[in-house]
A protein has these predicted regions:
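Conserved alpha/beta-domain cores
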Residues: 1-170
C-alpha cells in the first residue's frame, strides 16, 4: 500500500488491517519534503478509513532505487545498504521528526503503528526510538493531541539486522 486510493480499495475487501503502508510514495509524488500538515492529512485519512484496524506505516525509505528529485544522495559503492531510509532520518533529524509528529497526531484517529526501515544496528533502533520520544515530548509541551501509546518496530530486511535480531527484539 502506498496511497489513500490503495487504502480505500483495501477497505472495500474488508481487510483486517494494513501491515505495510509505504510512506515514501507521498514523498516521491511531491516536489518537496511534505510538511507535517501535508503528511498528517494523508495519515489521518488513512487511519479514519481503517477505524480501529491496524495501520502500520513505514517511515521514509528512500535511497537505493527510490530517489527524490529534490534530494541529492551521495555517490556510494552500494547505495542499497548505505545512506538511505533510517540513516537519512537520523542524520537529517528534522525530516524524521516531521514525519513522526504527523504519525503521532494522526494516531488519534485510528490505530497507527510505526515501522522503521533498513535498520542495520542496535544503535539505530535506540536512536530512532529516542527521536520518537522527543517528538512525543514536543507535542505534549505544545498541547497537541497525539497517540501516546503508539506501537513502533523495525523492518528486518538487511543481513546486519538479522545478525543483531536478538538484541533488537529486546528494544522493540
Amino acid at each position: 500500500m502506498g496511497s489513500l486510493e490503495d487504502v480505500k480499495n483495501a477497505v472495500k475487501f474488508r481487510i483486517d488491517g494494513i501491515g505495510l503502508f509505504r510512506s515514501e510514495f507521498l514523498y516521491m509524488e511531491s516536489d518537496h519534503f511534505p510538511t507535517e500538515e501535508e503528511q498528517f492529512h494523508v495519515y489521518r485519512q488513512a487511519a479514519e478509513l481503517l477505524g480501529e484496524r491496524e495501520l502500520t506505516i513505514r517511515t521514509l525509505d528512500i535511497g537505493g532505487d527510490k530517489g527524490l528529485d529534490y534530494f541529492e544522495f551521495p555517490k556510494e559503492e552500494n547505495p542499497f545498504l548505505g545512506y538511505r531510509a533510517i540513516r537519512i532520518g537520523l542524520d537529517q533529524k528534522e525530516i524524521l521528526k516531521t514525519q513522526l509528529r504527523a504519525l503521532l497526531r494522526a494516531g488519534t484517529y485510528g490505530h497507527i503503528r510505526i515501522m522503521f526501515p533498513m535498520i542495520i544496528s542496535i544503535e539505530e533502533v535506540v536512536d530512532a526510538y529516542a527521536v520518537l520520544e522527543e517528538c512525543k515530548d514536543e507535542l505534549h509541551k505544545e498541547g497537541i493531541p497525539f497517540q501516546e501509546e503508539i506501537e513502533a518496530g523495525v523492518m528486518i530486511e538487511t543481513p546486519a539486522a538479522v545478525i543483531c535480531l536478538l538484541y533488537t527484539s529486546r528494544c522493540v
